[in-house]
Amino acid sequence: MGEGIQRLGAMEEIFGRDRLTEGLRGKVREMIMALAEAELAEVLAAGSYERSEGRLGYRNGKRQRSISTGLGATVIELPRARISAGERDKEWQSGLIARYQRRARSVDQALLGCYLSGANARRIRGALSPLLRGAPLSKSAISRLVGRLEALFTQWRSRSLASEAVVFLYLDAIALRVRIANKVISVPVLVGLGVKEDGQKVILDLELFQSESSSCWEGFFEGLISRGLKRPCVVIIDGNKGLRAAVEKNWPGTAVQRCTVHKLRNLERYAPRHALEEVKTDYHRIVYADSLEQAKKAYRDFISKWNKLAPKVVVSLEEAGEELLTFYRFPKSQWKSLRTTNAIERLNGEFRRRVKTQSSLPDARAAERLLFGLIISGQIQMRRIDGWREIKHVSPLKAA
């Protein structure tokens, strides 16, 4: 507490005394107490010192309570009362302020925001000292907030997906460093991101697995399908073989779009250094063509040109084949959104930016909870895809 007070004093030396906030804080104190008095009067069916035949209880003094609001900590006096409940009376409990509440919801939201940004308890106390104004903030208080987040995550993970009309489905993995069995290792969090008929993106599920093997991706699929997710029009994926096998096993014949950016990275690994730019230019003629017909011609030209000059490059291209061109079968306004898994890559970037202050996460559940918290707290925003107004014209495709 002393540290917080010292920091607050230092801030006042820098910025001067905040008389406006002090005045508003006093008004907030008066307003909270007035609201509590009005709430109690309604419950008792009688105001303070008012005689009434319909009285449902009686007042029993007041008690002091310190509460932190968006304007800082303030001490209020809450009325106490006994309420008639049959043969026995019971103590009145305000619906405005819960029994053990010490902070307004806005302060708890700020606490959670700091936690999700990677701050520990000491840093949180420092960052929020103007709000807390010396009020205690223990590790257990933060743990209770995290516990509420955990409960919400568990509920979210079991929600039905039957009503989610997903047209496009992006599947990819995010690598995080997590401590497992006393060793810090890099593990994938499998992510399913859907695009609904109104163009809005929605995270369908995220789950940490030990690898991106076929069995792990199949387990991820089983979770989605068991919760009611229906087959989408197209699935956008990278080149992971386990993921591709899981798509075919669970939704055989579903159209697949291979990420064109991931494939370019693969081609670059096999391209001769002196020919790298030329390979990229020829590849771009395939994935940035004006039509499917032009793309197919560019594809054939690429193979014809590089088959002898860089055969491994051609083998890599043919591994994906026409699944690189699936997006051309959709409205042109949607091509940019459909040809890559960038929708999840952007999430990956946001996640990494927020966890870079932590060398590793303490366990698997903490990693999942952190990603979930960043999404539901609004710290990560997802916009509609390009060309969403034309989604109504999209119909299921057969595999290329």
Task: Please annotate each region the language model reported.
Residues 59-62, 79-100, 133-237, 241, ...:
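RNase H-like nuclease fold core
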Residues 1-11, 15, 19, 42, ...:
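Acidic/histidine-rich catalytic cores and adjacent linkers
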Residues 38, 42-46, 114-117, 130-131, ...:
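Conserved, well-folded catalytic cores of nucleic-acid-processing
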Residues 1-120, 125-151, 155-165:
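Short, flexible loop/hinge motifs at secondary-structure junctions
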Residues 234-241, 246-282:
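Conserved beta-strand -> loop -> alpha-helix junction used to position metal-binding or nucleic-acid-contacting
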Residues 36, 40, 71, 83, ...:
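Mobile genetic element proteins and their domesticated derivatives, centered on retroelements
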Residues 34, 38, 109, 122-126, ...:
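Solvent-exposed alpha-helical segments within well-ordered globular domains of core cellular machineries
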